[in-house]
Amino acid sequence: MVQEIAQEIIRSARKKGAQDIYFVPKLDAYELHMRVGDERCKIGSYDFEKFAAVISHFKFVAGMNVGEKRRSQLGSCDYAYDQKMSSLRLSTVGDYRGHESLVIRLLHDEEQDLHFWFQDIDELGKQYRQRGLYLFAGPVGSGKTTLMHELAKSIFKGQQVMSIEDPVEIKQDDMLQLQLNEAIGLTYENLIKLSLRHRPDLLIIGEIRDSETVRAVVRASLTGATVFSTIHAKSIRGVYERLLELGVSEEELAVVLQGVCYQRLIGGGGIVDFANKDYQEHQPTSWNEQIDQLLKDGHITSLQAETEKISYS
């Protein structure tokens, strides 16, 4: 019974195209939420004991400590349902009452269709011809990883492409993919050093998380390889400011940074803002014009348009 409920949750999430599933404890029930794109919606409220058992089921499959309900835990697994396998990442923590919450990240390990409202992949690819560092920013589920892989296939076909990810999200037979495992010393820093010995034409680094990672990314870019990576920021100018916060100098950025792409999924499609110079002074004119066009064409509401526009005060 518990396994059937768990499988139905994963089945439903996959059908909806959800990125995350949330089990939220209340006083005497569990609420189930799913996030699709930028929207998080409540699916329903369910029996507390039954859904606590569902959480324990997922934890067991992911190799987590089922008896520990207060301390935070992380886990991952390939979950079987309908003769399919779904890659999951799990995170749990208990509240002050000892009631456990669970977030499941669904990894879409097959490439998703990436539809842009106003851009074409081939046109975007023309921006990535110079060697150096290219950064992709945007919220979770905005298609950053998919876009990086699409560009890798179109620009670097037949060349040496490597990726360093945590975890590997899109499995590719035509590139060498490395996965972090800090328990055995496979950190971003060490894997970047290792990958450079293979002299890749393109190195994809899953995410810039801290100053140590960004230093390694900059060093890799200085070797002459082309490097793709993602970073958390809310605009192109925000990417530049974030790099400075992490300790990269303006002089280094002038040498290695070849382009910044900011993207979001809005109204069922993606929109992109790209810059290859003057990042700190970049104006979101193109971005806001795209938002206005989506509003005019009826794809988003006026409230969504105001929310999605970028302004610098």
Segments predicted by a language model, with ranges:
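Short, flexible helix-loop junctions that flank or precede catalytic/ligand sites
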Residues: 1-313
